[in-house]
């Protein structure tokens, strides 16, 4: 089977080959880290991901887990792809809604 190169979730399309993201068919520019974070969320739709999981996957273990870098990037992503798509699960982390 052909390798999946485009991830889709509720109006979002993320092309792993071209590193392009579309929201409802409109192209959106993301930084490399934003792209990685969105890719992680889109690979686990509906699943709650902890900040620690996000930190280790997107930034590597050399970042301080007490850092708010995940929250800052989630805010930036929400502005670009729509706040309603990324849900905060209090005390847990974040999840992507479909």
Where are the model-predicted features located?
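Short, cationic-aromatic polyanion-contact patches
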Residues: 95-98
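Short, surface-exposed charged micro-motifs
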Residues: 11-13, 85
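Basic, amphipathic DNA-recognition helix from helix-turn-helix-like DNA-binding domains
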Residues: 1-8
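Short strand-coil-strand connectors
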Residues: 8-10, 17, 24
């Amino acid at each position: 089977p052909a390798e999946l190169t485009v991830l889709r979730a509720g109006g979002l399309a993320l092309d792993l080959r071209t590193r392009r993201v579309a929201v409802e068919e409109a192209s959106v520019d993301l930084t490399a880290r934003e792209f990685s974070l969105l890719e992680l969320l889109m690979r686990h739709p509906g699943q709650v991901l902890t900040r620690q999981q996000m930190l280790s996957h997107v930034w590597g273990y050399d970042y301080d887990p007490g850092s708010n870098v995940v929250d800052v990037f989630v805010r930036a992503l929400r502005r670009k792809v729509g706040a309603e798509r990324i849900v905060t699960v209090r005390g847990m982390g974040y999840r992507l809604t479909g």
